[in-house]
A protein has these predicted regions:
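Catalytic cores of secreted/periplasmic lytic hydrolases that degrade extracellular macromolecules
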Residues: 2-139, 143-258
C-alpha cells in the first residue's frame, strides 16, 4: 500500500511537470514560428550528378520552389496581421496585450524602432514584411550556390551566400582574406536557411532600395516583378551592377524552366 502511494505521488508530480512544460511555458505564436516545409531536413539532392544541364536546372528549381512558397506564405501571414492591427488603429479600436506583444516581436525581428507614431511603425513594417518573387529567389540561389553544388549548400543548406560573424557559426572560406573574421553561415535545415535569407533581404539596410522598388509596385497596384527587384540588389555582391545584369539574364533565360 505504501509503495502504491509513492507511485501515485510520483505519477502526479510527473503529470504536473509535463503540464507546466507544455501549457504554462510561453509558446511561440504562428507569427513568430519559422515554418518548416516537408523537405526541410531531407538530404540535399546531388545536383552535380545530373549531367544534362536542363534536367539539372529543373531539379534545382523543383527542390527549392516549395520552400520559397512556404516562407512567402508565412511572410504574407505576418503582413496580414500588421494590416489588421493598422485597421484597428485607424478605427480607434483597442489593440490587445497579446497583439501588442506580437507587434513588438515583429518590430524587433524586422529592425523597426519603437515610435509613439503607430502609423509610421505600420508603414515601416509593411515596407519590410513582404514577399520576394519566387523567380528572383530561384535564380539568386542558383547563382550563389553554383546550382546547388557548392559545399556550403551541400553541407549547410546555405544556397544564399550568407555570412555570419561568430567564431564557429559556419564554414571558414578557403579564400578568406588575412585578418577577416567572417564565416559562411551553416543552417540546420532548408527552412531556417530560407527564412534567414528572406529576412535579410527584408530588413538589412543594404537592400532598402529593393524594398523601395517593391513598395512602389505595391502602391501602384502592379505585380511584384523579379526583374524589377534585381535593381535593388547591387550591394548583394561585390560585382555590383554586373551581378544585377547576370541575375536579369538568368531570369530571362530560365523563365520556361521555373
Amino acid at each position: 500500500m505504501h509503495k502504491l502511494k509513492i507511485i501515485s505521488i510520483a505519477i502526479t508530480v510527473l503529470l504536473l511537470v509535463v503540464f507546466s512544460v507544455y501549457f504554462l511555458q510561453p509558446q511561440k505564436s504562428e507569427i513568430q514560428e519559422i515554418p518548416q516545409s516537408v523537405s526541410a531536413k531531407q538530404a540535399i539532392p546531388d545536383f552535380a550528378e545530373i549531367k544534362q544541364t536542363t534536367e539539372k536546372k529543373k531539379a534545382f528549381f523543383s527542390y527549392l520552389r516549395p520552400e520559397v512558397e512556404t516562407q512567402n506564405a508565412h511572410i504574407l501571414l505576418q503582413r496580414e496581421f500588421v494590416h489588421g492591427l493598422r485597421a484597428k488603429h485607424i478605427a480607434e479600436e483597442q489593440i490587445t496585450e497579446s497583439q501588442m506583444e506580437e507587434l513588438l516581436w515583429l518590430m524587433k525581428e524586422y529592425r523597426v524602432e519603437e515610435n509613439d507614431d503607430l502609423d509610421l511603425v505600420f508603414d515601416k513594417l509593411l515596407t519590410r514584411i513582404d514577399i520576394v518573387p519566387v523567380e528572383l529567389v530561384l535564380v539568386q540561389t542558383a547563382n550563389e550556390s553554383a546550382w546547388g553544388t557548392s559545399r556550403f549548400a551541400r553541407k549547410g543548406y546555405n544556397f544564399f551566400g550568407l555570412w555570419c560573424f561568430r567564431k564557429g557559426c559556419g564554414f571558414v572560406p578557403k579564400r578568406r582574406n588575412d585578418g577577416a573574421a567572417h564565416e559562411v553561415a551553416k543552417f540546420d535545415d532548408l527552412s531556417t536557411g530560407m527564412y534567414t535569407y528572406l529576412r535579410n533581404l527584408n530588413r538589412h539596410d543594404a537592400y532598402k532600395e529593393m524594398r523601395a522598388i517593391r513598395k512602389q509596385l505595391r502602391d501602384q497596384m502592379k505585380p511584384i516583378s523579379a526583374t524589377a527587384l534585381t535593381e535593388g540588389l547591387t550591394k548583394y555582391s561585390e560585382r555590383g551592377d554586373d551581378y544585377v545584369v547576370e541575375l536579369k539574364h538568368m531570369i530571362r533565360t530560365n523563365q520556361d524552366l521555373m
